[in-house]
Curated annotation (Swiss-Prot):
Organism listed in the record: Asticcacaulis excentricus (strain ATCC 15261 / DSM 4724 / KCTC 12464 / NCIMB 9791 / VKM B-1370 / CB 48)
Major site of localization recorded for this protein: cytoplasm
GN (gene name): atxE2
Record's protein name: Lasso peptide isopeptidase AtxE2
Site (Important for activity. Binds to Astexin-3) location in chain: W116, N562
Outcome after substituting N121A: Increase in activity
Length: 695
């Protein structure tokens, strides 16, 4: 049996003391003159419960049949070995005993889903959420685990007495569930393996370039849908397998609906007030027996994200988003026969993957300075209590100051974001500002994709704006389909202007308060945030330096690099993939036609999978003698998954902004070549003609 409480997956350096993160003795902090700062090394080693991209309904946790234990997976990165360590953890829900690791090991299993007609999309880089399944007796867990590139089903004793693979096939297993203590049903797609083998055979004669290709993620055809799912049943005692019956398949496919609950004969669900309008508010609906549905008219019944029924107490509990720009989460209790909800808890931050256990919820919870942990939330009093924290020592570090910002932008839209200031910030001091996009709910780690280290940037002396993208103007209007709304948002880049205007409004607000130096503002972004970087550098004069994790927003990337299938689909959404860069659509975002007008130093930190899409824009900037650098990380995806790369991205981002916004350099000998390149870029910038002002 391994105790999670004393396990120390990685070592870090704090001053001259080398110790293990999560196991730093209290005396070490007490003896120190001051608490140590949050460095990139500390941030990259933080342990995560589940996947980095979890939402309120992501199934992060699994309660035992008797409710006495909760099981979950923890991942911790080690940049020295460049490995992610995975642990399957079991914790008593009463908190009376230490958590134990029932399994340690496995490879990084990428989250991939069918999309755009591909049977399996290219990995985004995020890890798949692994929700363990409890045996009916509560003695074992079954779960997916990848080793040597093969996804199998593993079984572990919940007492920590051992774990081993129990199901392996010629194809990857995609789901598993217990039928009884000795029988498992599982699913996978053997046809996918067969289709890949056919592509391999075809390659001997040469592949025809067609809609199977997505050049941005590789020079190989992708398998297209449909690929049938096969369901098998394994008898653990005899080892025999057979095809699953329809009833057994239904057991595996049955998933709880987070927006549906029963209390006695009353069914509660959520529906839009106008079913034909995709932007109409959602509200709670109750249907008693075979009677007519009754809509709850209370404002508190809108924007519900999760619900649970309690038949014993004749009560419905639900979580919802509320407050300014829906920046808070709240828990409500409502009598099943009254439709009068009462709020019992609310806060900024996130509750994720909640499971109800008697009179409380067990949830993954995070806030601005609190990484994801497990808590219990009392359904009567609303009291929150910690249950399990995989990063217990972070609070002993010298943490920056965080302020929640709210404003109404120039388009009348409610906005929230977070301002993060150095721990020793003195009121009235104007600091250089770094903007990190584009979600600011929960722990302020590295923004979307986790590439721009918020707390270490603040520790380095920057003010950091953790920017939460506003709702689009179109989202307040009536549309009958997402395609129609998307076309409206891309018309004249309407939504991108809304985002840029919001950023400028926030910069102006911080300038008026005397917090920032408006001449030293840096902008970062990944994915949609990268598009905002490209758009912002071309259409605004506010940014003195920028870092982007992908590039670029132009015709080549949208049409050529996305291939025939996706580029055709994008056009339906309002993206003009058949228009050249100098056409009216791309003129607002393309570096190719705007290079001579730009002067902002730009660092592109790209995955090798995506760098080809950056070359037209990067080359145009280079040929125009503009300060730009392209770094390529091998074997990476849209979101970087390798710990060594994440640490390198963290450090280079801080170095870039210190160089351009603070005129500071790191004297470390191994960074000498980096600063030689950057000083050459600075000299190049000083010699180049003045750029054309942005509109």
């Amino acid at each position: 049996m391994r105790s999670s409480k004393i396990r120390c997956p990685g070592a870090i350096r704090v001053g001259t003391l080398v110790t293990a993160f999560g196991c730093l003795p209290h005396v070490a902090f007490a003896a120190a003159r001051e608490a140590p700062p949050v460095t990139p090394e500390v941030l990259v080693r933080l342990a995560d419960i589940g996947t980095m991209s979890a939402s309120e309904t992501t199934p992060l946790l699994s309660l035992s049949p008797d409710g006495r234990y909760v099981a979950f997976q923890v991942r911790q990165a080690d940049p020295v070995t460049n490995l992610n360590v995975f642990r399957m953890v079991v914790k008593a829900t009463d908190g009376a005993t230490d958590a134990i690791d029932v399994d340690v090991g496995g490879e990084y299993l990428f989250w991939t889903i069918p999309s755009w007609g591909y049977a399996r999309n290219a990995p985004s880089g995020a890890n798949l959420t692994i929700q363990p399944r409890w045996s009916p007796s509560g003695t074992h867990l079954a779960y997916l685990r990848q080793d040597q590139g093969r996804v199998r089903v593993w079984r572990a004793s919940v007492k920590g007495e051992g774990a081993s693979p129990v199901i392996e096939d010629a194809y990857d297993i995609e789901d598993v569930q217990w039928l009884d203590d000795n029988t498992l049903i599982y699913s996978g797609r053997p046809g996918f393996v067969e289709a890949e083998a056919e592509i391999e055979r075809e390659g001997r004669r040469g592949w025809v370039y067609d809609e199977r290709f997505h050049p941005l993620t590789g020079a190989r055809p992708r398998v297209l849908e449909p690929i049938s799912i096969v369901y098998q049943v394994l008898d653990l005692k005899t080892g025999t397998r057979r095809a699953a019956t329809p009833t057994e398949v239904a057991r595996l496919r049955e998933k709880p609906d987070p927006l549906r609950a029963m209390v006695g004969r009353t069914t509660f669900s959520v529906s839009r007030t106008d079913p034909q309008n995709i932007n109409a508010p959602t509200t709670l609906v109750a249907r008693r027996g075979e009677g007519e549905p009754v809509r709850c008219d209370e404002e508190a019944c809108q924007n519900i994200t999760r619900m649970w029924g309690d038949e014993t107490a004749n009560v419905l509990y639900f979580l919802r988003r509320e407050g300014w720009a829906s920046n808070e989460m709240a828990l409500y209790r409502m009598p099943a026969d009254a439709l009068k909800p009462v709020r019992i808890w609310h806060a900024t931050g996130l509750l994720q993957g909640c499971e109800r256990q008697a009179k409380r919820l067990i949830c993954a919870q995070e806030s601005a300075l609190q990484p994801r942990r497990l808590v219990t939330l009392n359904l009567t009093s609303g009291q929150m209590s910690p249950l399990y924290d995989p990063n217990p020592d972070l609070s002993r570090y010298r943490l920056p100051k965080v302020e929640r910002l709210t404003l109404r932008n120039r388009n009348g839209i409610e906005v929230f974001s977070d301002l993060v200031l150095p721990p020793d910030y003195q009121l009235g001091t104007r600091l250089p500002l770094v903007i990190v996009q584009y979600s600011s709910r929960g722990f302020l780690r590295g923004g979307t994709g986790d590439e721009n280290p918020i707390l270490p940037l603040a520790t380095a002396g920057f003010a950091v704006l953790s920017f939460h993208s506003p709702r689009s103007e179109a989202s307040y209007q009536r549309f009958t389909s997402p395609i129609a709304q998307s076309k409206a948002e891309y018309s004249n880049w309407r939504n991108r202007w809304n985002i840029l205007h919001t950023l400028e409004d926030l910069i102006d607000d911080l300038d008026r308060r005397g917090v920032i130096d408006p001449a030293r503002v840096g902008l970062t972004g990944l994915s949609d945030g990268a598009t905002t970087v490209h758009f912002g550098l071309i259409n605004s004069h506010r940014f003195a330096a920028a870092v982007t994790s992908s590039c670029c927003t132009d015709s080549f990337t949208a049409s050529v690099m996305n291939g025939p299938r996706i580029s055709g689909a994008l056009k339906a959404y309002g993206i003009e993939t058949d228009q050249a860069d100098d056409g009216p659509f791309w003129a607002a975002t393309s570096f190719v036609v705007n290079a001579s007008r730009l002067d902002t130093p730009l660092l592109i930190q790209s995955a090798d999978e995506e760098y080809l899409g950056a070359l037209p824009g990067f080359t145009a900037l280079q040929q125009a003698r503009k300060p730009v650098e392209l770094i390529i990380y091998p074997n990476e995806h849209h979101v970087k998954w390798q710990p060594a790369h994440r640490l390198a991205v963290y450090n280079r981002t801080i170095d870039w902004f210190r160089f351009w916004l603070m005129d500071q350099s790191d004297p470390a000998p191994d960074k000498a070549a980096q600063y030689d390149r950057w000083r050459a870029l600075r000299a190049l910038r000083q010699k180049s003609p003045s750029p054309t002002p942005a509109p």
